Each structure stands twice: as structure tokens, then as C-alpha cells.
Amino acid sequence: MKWETVIGLEIHVQLNTKSKIFSSALTKYGKKPNSQACAIDLGLPGVLPVLNVEAVNKAIRFGVAINAHINKRNIFDRKNYFYPDLPKGYQISQMDWPIIGKGKIEIILGNQTKVICITRAHLEEDAGKSIHDMFDDNTAIDLNRAGIPLLEIVSEPDMRSAKEAVAYTKKIHTLVQYIDICDGNMQEGSFRCDANISIRPKGQKELGTRAELKNINSFKFLERAINFEVKRQKDILEEGEKVVQETRLYDSIKNETRSMRLKEETNDYRYFPDPDLLPIEISNELLEKVKQTLPELPDQRKTRFVVELGLSEYDADVLTSQKSLADYFEVMLEDNIVNIKLCANWVMGELSAALNKHQIDIQNSPITAPALSLLISRISDDTISVKTAKDVFKYMWDSKNSADEIIKVRGLKQMTNMVEIEVIIEQVIANSTLQVSQFKLGNNKILGFFIGKIMELTGGKVNPKQVNELLRKKLL
């Protein structure tokens, strides 16, 4: 039997506010456990929540960015369940009247474009964190995360493969960074998702029984987890068994999912309006203000890179996939608009490779955008070859000296005296009679031998293109 995969995602975006959504406690990551949890976060008797308006504004920014319906009046509800890292015994969330209604995101896979519909996006508070490996027989609770504002973005079950799910998640990840509502740090849990997965016979409209994979914080893990879960469900159904509706956890080391608990239904949470919080009223003036302050969005920037800068769709897509990467590239162009393609190649090539190797963000790159732009200029004006430029790049990375300083101190400037270059070429030809004969018999590959010898004699300080042209003239 042929099966169809059905995937819906719930993406949890930590909003980058300075204080929590219902208290004045700070939201900095990595602080001493329970040092950023106040009486409200601890759920102590007699305390009342106070809404952080900045969290509301950031949620609206997302809604406007995806052209979604903004609910002018929305309310907070209590989601009741017991868990050790939820001290109040309930989570403040939004059920019937979320801040963001229906919207959509467009993804591209290969040459295919697909629209993924968004059901809703609602504000809620994050829970604390249970730490199971700190003590042998006990679980530690850190409530620093409790109360951090979350925007939960819920998609329709519109995705049909793991690759579509990853493309959608990456699109949201890029967008929330562009509009500055989240830092997107998946390692620190600022951006994570739950995947609801089911399968059904191809052509059937009714959805199958779903399993929910919780708290996935990596694009790679998301793809692997979905693929494993789809295979698991297929195996169960093809053996004549039934899939159980449950919550599962992905084990990235074993590359498998395992059961956590049976999946709760909405009624199990006994939602009801929070009596301590007034409804949120959103005015037309506020919506207009948010629209006016919205920056250039990723798709708009990509289009501009293609239309105005002449980049390919692929290059523009890579460069705009991270706001910081696109910003770096545009700073390079401020002094190097004549070398757009060369700048793009170096950002996507040498720079990205070095950043990945050393596992650092582009914001912390030891080579600044103006510094790399200068290096590109030295390739463009034939001061150094591309090969030499790669060596200069490594010296720049380690020393933080400028390209010009390194070229001067190390004597890397290309030879420009054509008379001297011709003498060296003639010397190589005179000492390579066998190779000359092979070339004249039609072996063009032997040119690499000559160029290698010339590079060796000049210490790589000649322009390979010029050498190639001169060499051909001398040999013919």
C-alpha cells in the first residue's frame, strides 16, 4: 500500500524581551539556576501577573510580517496540568482568542513553490526546566526559564515530507530574526518545535492517528526524527496493528523516537479565561505603527538581490537565509559594488567555511566585512591571485591584520613586470622539450605542468590567467 505522510508543526519562539511576560524578572540565558525567578514565576500565593506590552508588540510584528489576521481583542487562558517545572499548576496561554489568526508562509523546494497555512499564533509563558542528570536520585528544577514569553506558531497539517517541514521551519527561523523578535538560538532553546506526524493511505482524506514529537531544536534532528517516525508508523500499520496517539521524544544519539506519555486532548487541560488578566485590546493605530517599523523582509531582500544586484536565485537565497549574513554582505558592497559576484562567492565560500570550522557566528568573525572587502579588491586589481588570497585570508583570520599589511610583510604581491615573466616562461619551455612536444601533438592538459613550474619559480606571484595566455603564445 502507498502511504501519505501528514505533518503539522508547532514552533515555539522565545520572544527577546528584557523581562518576562508577566513579571519583571530578567530573561538572560545561562545565569545561576533560579536567580532570575521572582515570586510571580514561583507561583507564590497573593501575587498577580502584569502583562509585558513589549511581548504583545513583538507578536503583532510577526502577524503583520506574514499578513495574518490580527485579533483586535484576545484573552489569556489557564492551561491546567501538573509538572514539577510548572509551579503554579497551570500555564498562562491563549486558547479561544489568540493574538494571531490565520496566515501563510511560502516555501521553495527545488523548483517547486508551496504555501503552508498557519492556523494561529498565540502568546504564552514558557515553563521551567527539569534537569535529570545533576543528581543520582533526584531531578533539579531551574525556574529561570519559567515565564519567558513564547509565541507558539501552529501550522495546518499541510506538509507531506520531512524536507517540507525543514524548509518551513527554516523560513520561520529566518523571519523571526529579520523582524527582531527572537535571536533564533536553537542550542539555547530560543527556537524549538513540536512535530505532529501521521500517515494515511494515499488518496484518503481522513487523517490518521498522530504522534507528537516534542522539543526538537535542530533542523537536522527534525528531518531525522520525522523520517524515523514515519517509518515506525508504516511498520506498525503494515503489520496490522494500530498507531497509538501519544507524545514521543526523539533520541538524537540512537536516532529513534520513544514514548513519553499518552497524548492529551484539549479537554484534559480544562482551559478557562485567566481571571487575573484583562483582555488585550489592539487598536488600528498600533497596527499601523507596527507596519511602519517593519524592516525589509527576507523574501523582499532576496528579490532585491536578484533584481538590483544581478545575483542568481540560489546565491540570493543563501545570502538572505540569515539576516547577519546578508548584513555582512551588504556592508562589503559599500566599498566594493563593482565586485558583487566575487564578494558573494567569498561570503558563501571561504568565510562560511571558516565560521563553520571554528563554530562561531558571523557577528563574532575575526575578519570584518570591510576587511574582507579590501581583500576582494586586491584580487580584482590583480595585486594577488585567488590562490594567494586564500592564504592571506587564513593569515587575516589568525592575526587580524589587514590584507594590505599581510601582502606587504610577506611579499605576496603579484609580479607585474611582463619582461621578467616572459623570461621565466621561456626558461621553463627551454627545459621541458618533452612536454613541449606533447603539447604540439594536441595534449592541452600538459599546460598544467608548465603553469605549475612557473608558479614554483615565481613563488605563486604571477597571475595564472596572464601566464596561461603568454604560455600559449610562446608554445604555438
From Swiss-Prot:
Q: What is its EC number?
A: 6.3.5.-
PROSITE patterns with a match to the protein in the record: GATB
Q: Which InterPro entries match?
A: Asn/Gln-tRNA_amidoTrfase_suB/E (IPR017959), Asn/Gln-tRNA_Trfase_suB/E_cat (IPR006075), Asn/Gln_amidotransferase (IPR018027), Asn/Gln_tRNA_amidoTrase-B-like (IPR003789), GatB (IPR004413), GatB_C_1 (IPR042114), GatB_Yqey_C_2 (IPR023168), Gln-tRNA_amidoTrfase_suB_CS (IPR017958)
- What is catalysed by this protein? L-glutamyl-tRNA(Gln) + L-glutamine + ATP + H2O = L-glutaminyl-tRNA(Gln) + L-glutamate + ADP + phosphate + H(+); L-aspartyl-tRNA(Asn) + L-glutamine + ATP + H2O = L-asparaginyl-tRNA(Asn) + L-glutamate + ADP + phosphate + 2 H(+)
**Superkingdom, according to UniProt?**
Bacteria
Which Pfam families does its entry note?
Answer: GatB_N (PF02934), GatB_Yqey (PF02637)
Entry-linked Gene3D superfamilies: 1.10.10.410, GatB domain, N-terminal subdomain
Q: List the disulfide bonds.
A: none
A molecular function (GO) term: glutaminyl-tRNA synthase (glutamine-hydrolyzing) activity
Which key words are in the record?
A: ATP-binding, Ligase, Nucleotide-binding, Protein biosynthesis
Give the record's GO biological process terms.
glutaminyl-tRNAGln biosynthesis via transamidation; translation
**Which top class of enzyme applies to this chain?**
ligase
Q: What does this protein do?
A: Allows the formation of correctly charged Asn-tRNA(Asn) or Gln-tRNA(Gln) through the transamidation of misacylated Asp-tRNA(Asn) or Glu-tRNA(Gln) in organisms which lack either or both of asparaginyl-tRNA or glutaminyl-tRNA synthetases. The reaction takes place in the presence of glutamine and ATP through an activated phospho-Asp-tRNA(Asn) or phospho-Glu-tRNA(Gln).
Q: How does it assemble?
A: Heterotrimer of A, B and C subunits.
* Family affiliation: Belongs to the GatB/GatE family. GatB subfamily.
Q: What protein is this chain from?
A: Aspartyl/glutamyl-tRNA(Asn/Gln) amidotransferase subunit B
Organism field:
Vesicomyosocius okutanii subsp. Calyptogena okutanii (strain HA)
